[in-house]
Amino acid sequence: GFLNLTQDHLDYHGTMGVYRAAKLRLFETLLTRGRTAVLNADSDAYPAFAAEAVGAGQTIMSVGEAGQGLQLLERVLLPHGQQLKLRFEVRTYDVRLPLAGAFQASNALVAAGLCIAGGLSPEQAFAGLETIEGAPGRLQRVGAGPRGGEAYVDYAHTPDGLETVLKALRPHVRGKLIVVFGAGGDRDRGKRPLMGQIAADLAEVAIVTDDNPRGEVPAAIRAEIL
């Protein structure tokens, strides 16, 4: 399955081109001919991955708002989750996903598509989504304050990840959106000012702190973010 291609792991891959090539290997060499490639059609990189899968002799199940296999027709926010209206083949399904955020809906659709491609019925796959528990540290609700404010923890450590989380929480905010974040040391330095700008644009209050500086001077990392 393919979800997205964003600026991440460049400390390992070096460039986005190399990172993209590594993801394409899923369909070039690992998924065999005749199997189903489940692809997020809402990703900008979808055309390239779809072309690779077709060239490798695989069947495509595209998912998402633009999906032709498993389509997201509607998404309604709930206090701690979302109600999804999905279409698969000729039927529509209402699914209550107990996870917040548009990106969680994308994750869920790819997961459901993989289950269906693996032999489960749509009903079985969607029933599983309704009882799913989020991964620890992935938009995890960890508490609430006496005045109604809620606290979430997320692993976001890239510009895209931070932007995705802040946009996911924004519809639920009744007062101020406050973000506390940092950047790891000895990793991709180019993402630091990007994350700072995203926090400034999308949150009312941004608090920059230290996040595993490793061999770097913490103050220098904070300065690059700011």
Q: Residue ranges of each PLM-predicted region?
A:
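Active-site beta-alpha connecting loops in nucleotide-dependent enzymes
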Residues: A135-G137, D160-L226
